[in-house]
């Protein structure tokens, strides 16, 4: 179905699905906490699966791989220890180097360091959209989890303010600048590294899901901003 032939209601449902998936990915790439394994409980995962299906994609098998992996452990606490260990190895302290740094500046900036020019650019886009960094977020603004959450926020704000044409136009430009000019330029390389180097199914599967979704996002944005 082309964008031109969709009804307003269909476009809104697609936007909701996109926001749900970005929020889910943000949660998966955040530092693991006690609630993360529970994200895959049957009742909680259904919203994600429905959103995935609405976009014409199938995540059932991928989610089953994660839930099967989680059931190997006697409880969520044990699974969480494994997630925390792998998160640290992939994103923080692997030797001799971090295999998948989760920051845009490492991929977009010539220096390939954290807290680079791209970090400041991401923070400026957050500010332009009226969003500040939460006091509960203890990382760098261009962390992949923060950027996925920001993408979800932009889409949700457009839905909430759909009767405010000025706000919608501003958010649409920010979304274009952020997704096309920033997130989609570096996330594929990052996700490829995660899929290649992760030693547990959780991050392998989530990285593959994110890559599949972002291919669809690229196609969607090319149509919208043709």
PLM-predicted stretches and their roles:
Residues 1-226:
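Charged, alpha-helix-forming regions
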């Amino acid at each position: 179905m082309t964008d031109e032939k969709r009804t307003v209601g269909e476009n809104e449902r697609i936007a909701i699905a996109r926001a749900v998936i970005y929020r889910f990915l943000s949660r998966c790439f955040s530092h693991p906490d006690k609630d993360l394994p529970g994200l895959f409980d049957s009742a909680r995962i259904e919203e994600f699966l429905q959103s995935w299906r609405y976009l014409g994609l199938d995540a059932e098998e991928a989610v089953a791989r994660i839930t099967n992996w989680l059931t190997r452990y006697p409880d969520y606490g044990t699974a969480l220890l494994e997630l925390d260990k792998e998160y640290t190895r992939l994103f923080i302290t692997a030797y001799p180097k971090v295999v998948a740094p989760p920051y845009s500046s490492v991929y977009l900036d010539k220096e390939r360091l954290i807290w680079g020019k791209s970090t400041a650019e991401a923070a400026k886009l957050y500010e332009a959209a009226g969003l500040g960094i939460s006091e509960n977020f203890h990382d760098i603004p261009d962390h992949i989890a923060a950027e996925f959450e920001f993408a979800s926020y932009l889409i949700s704000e457009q839905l909430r303010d759909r009767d405010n044409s000025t706000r919608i136009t501003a958010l649409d430009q920010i979304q274009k600048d952020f997704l096309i000019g920033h997130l989609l330029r570096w996330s594929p390389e990052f996700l490829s590294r995660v899929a290649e180097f992760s030693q547990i199914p959780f991050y392998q599967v989530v990285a593959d899901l994110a890559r599949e979704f972002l291919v669809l996002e690229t196609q969607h944005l090319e149509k919208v901003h043709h």
